[in-house]
């Protein structure tokens, strides 16, 4: 173990300066108030012992017991749960200093910076330094991690105390000194978390010592928090020591933080009222569902119409995922709600007609047509949104590829150009020998060759930067700045190159010998080196392909490149042979010059390393291309798999639509048979849902693989979704229409033959075959059935069959009209006669009579809606059942 030299001191300052002490604060602490020192001794000793007892030991004198560093290291191991280095067991001073330094090293490793605390002061028993060190340990291991609403540790602990004691009288915690002198704050903290331990109402603000002692005794006995404070010291000190109180209060924080004939009449009234109540419930349910659906559409349309592009691929992928969630999770329930809303509306209107009630008119803006219009606007907003997202992702993908390519080429050029200006500015030729000047000239010629070889790269960098600007790359400013710097530097290099050549040519006449081997090496090595750099760039170049043909093209190009490697290796061997010849000449003639080539910056090691790098990159490129080829084959399989399913599902949906359409207009057979057939259709359709789900899964795989086209099918997932939703809506609506016809037939007493006759007449005059007759078709139908109609009579009939003024007559309205005069339905007169029986022939009825004869809820319904009776013989509490009955059938304004 290395010895720790005496005199080593730690000069660290903890980064969290909002609650860690600064060096100047330590200077002031050297003049610590004796009362504060006493409080800190007691508190810090108790705090240390509360942890040391877990290891079966304790301290008596804080500045003496830590001097050898053993218990200090043990304390740190207990509170951190980590092992410290093995202590030195000797008793000499340097052993003690070494142990204390190990403890201080561990504290510093936790990010704590100790100001002016050296191991010598601790070993010497300096009480100020010892207390400061223990306070630093308390801050790091007991207080630092306390955080409330992103506050610092001290502020977080204070805020925690303020919140916990806020409801208590006479408690106002503003600091960690004077706010705790009366002891009520400590008692309030205990009572807030353990009200069974203390009766706060019996505490006396004028007995601070008793309050503090009570709190500390309870904390020690029930909360395992040792006594760390002296009540008399806190009460009698004008400003108690803040560190002592913070240490003690933090123990509370850690302790507490871890811490679902008349009878016949009554039956008739109950039946009528039940129908009315159910109709009102359906009306309210329709209004509620319509409001919720319209509100959802209103909130969704702006989101779908937002075409603001994001700057990053991750953000656009998040938008695409949100849209997928909308199509998979949010929209399908709303499609069902819209369908259910139409079914409820038709059912309600049928029930109202059957029960001889007025037609239901939804509130303004909530008609079925209004909802259909809003839904159409939603579909219009949704159209093209996904295509826009995918186009944006392709654009960003292209941008990222170009940006990475720009960075690679720019980095390569900057690396090459680094230091070139300084080289060109040198005037070494002024003091060089004739041979050296000629060497400098040849070296400059090689540099010019290298410079010309880099011209293409600079042009490529500028072209890529221009394309990034045209595609609106989000970091175009930095790209332009970097490109401009490269171009400016390139211009300076050109100017400096020309000037240096002119200077060298002025001295060329002084040159007598040329080292042909060096010059030949320079001329051949520079292009070869540049070729290798270009080859490495090409081998590391990123590629993006979307088809097997594209990747095959890249593989072909790569194979062509590999075919050139033998020729390149021959060139490399020739260049190496030149250098070997140079070495041979130098050795043969004992020439005292460096074997380094004065005309070229390219070294043999550089050529070897780059050649090795090229050979390493070739198989890596092979693997990348083969992996991409495999991925493109997988994408092609996904396309074919999706197309096979879509080409089967699309015609199946169309066939089902045609079968349902034929079933809805058939004349022969009973309605129940037609219903059973439709139910079978519905069952088959529901069972077919698994095919749609599987297609959705394949479609998601295609999108996750970023496959953007599929030449194997004309069906897209959007076509299938729209067809499937239309099929579900059509079968549900058709079943509802047949159920309504059965309900009307049974309620009106129509035979199956009559129903078939009505259907035949309706189908004959339904010229557009859309289940509706306009006014002229309806008039022709009535005339064909023997009705002699004038304009007034026809207008009256139209108000019955087209109450909403839509200009069309449905099959259900046609049946209602044909059976209206002969059907056995209840009337207002029948209900009035029933009420008269319950009222014992009186023109009014009393609430008591209603409660006696009717069920409680329907009796209360009548009492709430019947107007007071004011006719002859009226008595207090008399109710007008005549007006009420007329209102039920829309014959009054009640």
UniProtKB/Swiss-Prot annotation:
Gene3D superfamilies: 1.20.58.60, Calponin-like domain, EF-hand. Residues 38-142, 151-257 form the Calponin-homology (CH) domain. One of its GO terms (cellular component) is Z disc. Spectrin repeats lie at residues 281-391, 401-506, 516-627, 637-740. Ca(2+) 1 binds at residues 766, 770, 777. One of its GO terms (molecular function) is structural constituent of postsynaptic actin cytoskeleton. Residues 1-254 are annotated as: Actin-binding. Keywords: Actin-binding, Calcium, Cytoplasm, Metal-binding, Phosphoprotein, Repeat, Ubl conjugation. InterPro entries: Actinin_actin-bd_CS, CH_dom, CH_dom_sf, EF-hand-dom_pair, EF-hand_Ca_insen, EF_hand_dom, Spectrin/alpha-actinin, Spectrin_repeat. It holds the Pfam family EF-hand_7. Residues 753-788, 789-824 form the EF-hand domain. It is found in: Cytoplasm, Myofibril, Sarcomere, Z line. Ubiquitinated by FBXL22, leading to proteasomal degradation. Ca(2+) 2 binds at residues 802, 804, 808. GO terms for biological process: actin filament uncapping; cardiac muscle cell development; focal adhesion assembly; microspike assembly; muscle contraction; negative regulation of potassium ion transport; negative regulation of protein localization to cell surface; phospholipase C-activating angiotensin-activated signaling pathway. Belongs to the alpha-actinin family. Homodimer; antiparallel. Also forms heterodimers with ACTN3. Interacts with ADAM12, MYOZ1, MYOZ2 and MYOZ3. Interacts via its C-terminal region with the LDB3 PDZ domain. Interacts with XIRP2. Interacts with DST (via N-terminus). Interacts with PARVB. Interacts with SYNPO2. F-actin cross-linking protein which is thought to anchor actin to a variety of intracellular structures. This is a bundling protein. This is Alpha-actinin-2. The lineage of its organism: Eukaryota, Metazoa, Chordata, Craniata, Vertebrata.
């Amino acid at each position: 173990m290395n010895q720790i030299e005496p005199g080593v001191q730690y000069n660290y300052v903890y980064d969290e300066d909002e609650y860690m002490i600064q060096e100047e604060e330590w200077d002031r602490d050297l003049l610590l108030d004796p009362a504060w020192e006493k409080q800190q001794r007691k508190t810090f000793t108790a705090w240390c012992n509360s942890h040391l007892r877990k290891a079966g030991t304790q301290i008596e004198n804080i500045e003496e017991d830590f001097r050898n560093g053993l218990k200090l290291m043990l304390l740190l191991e207990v509170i951190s749960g980590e092992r410290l280095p093995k202590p030195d067991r000797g008793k000499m001073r340097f052993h003690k200093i070494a142990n204390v330094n190990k403890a201080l090293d561990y504290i510093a490793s936790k990010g704590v910076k100790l100001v002016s605390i050296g191991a010598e002061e601790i070993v010497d028993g300096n009480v100020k330094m010892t207390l400061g060190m223990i306070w630093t340990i308390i801050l790091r291991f007991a207080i630092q991690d306390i955080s409330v609403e992103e506050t610092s540790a001290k502020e977080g602990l204070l805020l925690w105390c303020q919140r916990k004691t806020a409801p208590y009288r006479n408690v106002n915690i503003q600091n960690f000194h004077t706010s705790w002198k009366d002891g009520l704050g400590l008692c309030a903290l205990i009572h807030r978390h353990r009200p069974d331990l203390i009766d706060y109402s019996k505490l006396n603000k004028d007995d601070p010592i008793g309050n503090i002692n009570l709190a500390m005794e309870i904390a020690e006995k029930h909360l395992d928090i040792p006594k760390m404070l002296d009540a008399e010291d806190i009460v009698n000190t004008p400003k108690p020591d803040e560190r002592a109180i913070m240490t003690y209060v933090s123990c509370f924080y850690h302790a507490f933080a871890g811490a679902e004939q008349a009878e016949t009449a009554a039956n008739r009234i109950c039946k009528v009222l039940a129908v009315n109540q159910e109709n009102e419930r359906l009306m309210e349910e329709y209004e509620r569902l319509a409001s919720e659906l319209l509100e959802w559409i209103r909130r969704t349309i702006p989101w779908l119409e937002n075409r603001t592009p994001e700057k990053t691929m991750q953000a656009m992928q998040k938008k695409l995922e949100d849209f997928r969630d909308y199509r998979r999770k949010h929209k399908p329930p709303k499609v069902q709600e819209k369908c259910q809303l139409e079914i409820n509306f038709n059912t309600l209107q049928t029930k109202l007609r059957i029960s001889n009630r007025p037609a239901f008119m939804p509130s303004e803006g909530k008609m079925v047509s209004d909802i259909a219009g809003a839904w159409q606007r939603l579909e219009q907003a949704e159209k093209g949104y996904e295509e826009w997202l995918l186009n944006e992702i392709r654009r960003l993908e292209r941008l990222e590829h170009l940006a990475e390519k720009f960075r690679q080429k720019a980095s390569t050029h900057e690396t090459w150009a680094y230091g070139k200006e300084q080289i060109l500015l040198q005037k070494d030729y002024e003091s060089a020998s004739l041979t050296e000047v000629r060497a400098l000239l040849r070296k400059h010629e090689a540099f010019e060759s290298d410079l010309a070889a880099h011209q293409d790269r600079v042009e490529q960098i500028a072209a890529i930067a221009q394309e990034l600007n045209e595609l609106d790359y989000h970091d175009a400013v930095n790209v332009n700045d970097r490109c401009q710097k490269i171009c400016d530097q390139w211009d300076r290099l050109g100017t400096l190159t020309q000037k240096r050549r002119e200077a060298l040519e002025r001295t060329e006449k002084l040159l007598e010998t040329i080292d042909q081997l060096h010059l030949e090496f320079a001329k051949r090595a520079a292009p070869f080196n540049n070729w290798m750099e270009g080859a490495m760039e090409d081998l590391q170049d990123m590629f993006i392909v979307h088809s097997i043909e594209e990747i095959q093209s890249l593989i072909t190009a790569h194979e062509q490149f590999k075919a050139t490697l033998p020729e390149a290796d021959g060139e490399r061997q020739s260049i190496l042979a030149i250098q070997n010849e140079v070495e041979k000449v130098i050795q043969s003639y004992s020439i005292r010059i460096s074997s380094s080539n004065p005309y070229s910056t390219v070294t043999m090691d550089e050529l070897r390393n780059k050649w090795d790098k090229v050979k390493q990159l070739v198989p890596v490129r092979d693997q990348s291309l083969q992996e991409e080829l495999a991925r493109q084959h997988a994408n092609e399989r996904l396309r074919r798999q999706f197309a096979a399913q879509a080409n089967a599902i699309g015609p199946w949906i169309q066939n089902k639509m045609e079968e349902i359409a034929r079933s809805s207009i058939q004349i022969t057979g009973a309605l129940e048979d037609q219903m059973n057939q439709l139910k079978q259709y519905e069952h088959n359709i529901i069972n077919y849902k698994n095919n749609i789900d599987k297609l959705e899964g394949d479609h998601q795989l295609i999108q996750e693989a970023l496959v953007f086209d599929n030449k194997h099918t004309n069906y897209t997932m959007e076509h299938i979704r729209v067809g499937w939703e239309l099929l579900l809506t059509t079968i549900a609506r058709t079943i509802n229409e047949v159920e309504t016809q059965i309900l009307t037939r049974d309620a009106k007493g129509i035979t199956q033959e009559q129903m078939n006759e009505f259907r035949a007449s309706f189908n004959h005059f339904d010229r557009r075959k859309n289940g509706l007759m306009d006014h002229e078709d309806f008039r022709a139908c009535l005339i064909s059935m023997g009705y002699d109609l004038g304009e007034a009579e026809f207008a009256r009939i139209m108000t019955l069959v087209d109450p909403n003024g839509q200009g069309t007559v449905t099959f259900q309205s046609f049946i209602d009209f044909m059976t209206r005069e002969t059907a056995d339905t209840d009337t207002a007169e029948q209900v009035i006669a029933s009420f008269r029986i319950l009222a014992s022939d009186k023109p009014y009825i009393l609430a008591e009579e209603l409660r006696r004869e009717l069920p409680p809820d329907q009796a209360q319904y009548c009492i709430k809606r019947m107007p007071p009776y004011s006719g002859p013989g009226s008595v207090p509490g008399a109710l007008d059942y005549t007006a009420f009955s007329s209102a039920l059938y829309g014959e009054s304004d009640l």
